[in-house]
From Swiss-Prot:
A lipid is attached at residue 21 (N-palmitoyl cysteine). InterPro entries: Solute-binding_3/MltF_N. This is L-cystine-binding protein TcyJ. Keywords: Amino-acid transport, Cell membrane, Lipoprotein, Membrane, Palmitate, Signal, Transport. Part of the ABC transporter complex TcyJKLMN involved in L-cystine import. Is also involved in cystathionine, djenkolate, and S-methylcysteine transport. SUPFAM superfamilies: Periplasmic binding protein-like II. Belongs to the bacterial solute-binding protein 3 family. It comes from Bacillus subtilis (strain 168). One of its GO terms (biological process) is amino acid transport.
């Protein structure tokens, strides 16, 4: 009789332990908040499709590393044209943008940034390899510069034109990352403002012959963008970025995807 009671008690203990484990796992699953990460597929080395059609690049891999550091979230990527990213964030179709985004006053009015930049984008004047006349902004007077319509480069040239009598003809690129390079290659534009890693990627993958010239015009701090109500997510992202910077992950990913360590400002090096 005692043996039977002991067996029943033992089975009851196992059942309780099993039930407890199941509840803990389910609770963890329920607590994990799904975060939709909006990004593009045409940004060389940053967010693009590789030869296997897989989404990858510096921003993508940094986001995956952040996801591993934050068990309370599950990140899912949603791709779209760059021109639709801000609208989708504003409409809450996505929760965060990962696409080499810089701050500007207009964006800060509508959206939220975390505090610690995860990358810096040094921007240079970019021309064809056989162009030996353009080296500075003054050399661009009377020339056509092509940039993305909502890019930091567009904002920079627009401000320059306002204070210098609009000497540079500003032209906006169409869809796709190749449009800018194609227009420079064919002579429809004289220059653009780009990063060395983007130029190198285009030269290797599309046989363009272009180069960066002169000094760094901008060394833009790069952030992820959130909706105004996502302060907790932004703060958690900051903590993860600090850890990734400290343990060398950002430097490692930057060197792998961008060819150098851009986790620090060029002006600090």
């Amino acid at each position: 009789m005692n043996k039977r009671k002991g067996l029943v008690l033992l089975l009851s203990v196992f059942a309780l332990l099993g039930g407890g484990c199941s509840q803990t796992n389910n609770k963890t699953d329920r607590q994990a908040q799904t975060v939709i990460v909006g990004t593009g597929t045409d940004f060389p080395n940053i967010a693009f499709l590789n030869e296997k059609g897989e989404l990858t690049g510096y921003d993508i891999e940094v986001m995956k590393a952040i996801d591993k550091e934050l068990p309370q979230y599950t990140f899912e990527f949603k791709t779209m044209d760059f021109s639709n990213l801000l609208t989708s964030l504003g409409n809450k179709k996505i929760d965060v943008i990962a696409h080499n985004m810089a701050k500007n006053k207009e964006r800060e009015k509508r959206f939220l940034y975390h505090k610690v930049p995860y990358n810096y984008s040094p921007m240079y004047i970019t021309v064809k390899e056989d162009n030996h006349k353009i080296h500075t902004l003054k050399d661009l007077h009377g020339k056509t510069v092509i940039v993305g319509a909502t890019s930091n480069a567009a904002d920079y040239i627009t401000k320059y034109n306002k204070t210098h009598g609009s000497p540079i003809h500003l032209k906006y690129a169409g869809q796709g990352s190749n449009d800018t390079a194609n227009q420079i290659e064919t002579g429809r534009a004289d220059a653009t403002i780009a990063t060395p890693f983007a130029v190198d990627f285009q030269n290797k993958t599309h046989a363009f012959r272009q180069k960066t010239v002169g000094d760094v015009l901008l060394d833009t701090e790069v952030y992820f963008m959130f909706n105004k109500g996502s302060q907790t997510l932004a703060d958690d992202t900051d903590q993860a970025i600090k850890k990734l910077e400290k343990n060398g992950t950002l430097k490692k990913l930057s060197r792998k995807w961008l060819g150098a360590d851009y986790s620090k400002s060029s002006f600090e090096k």
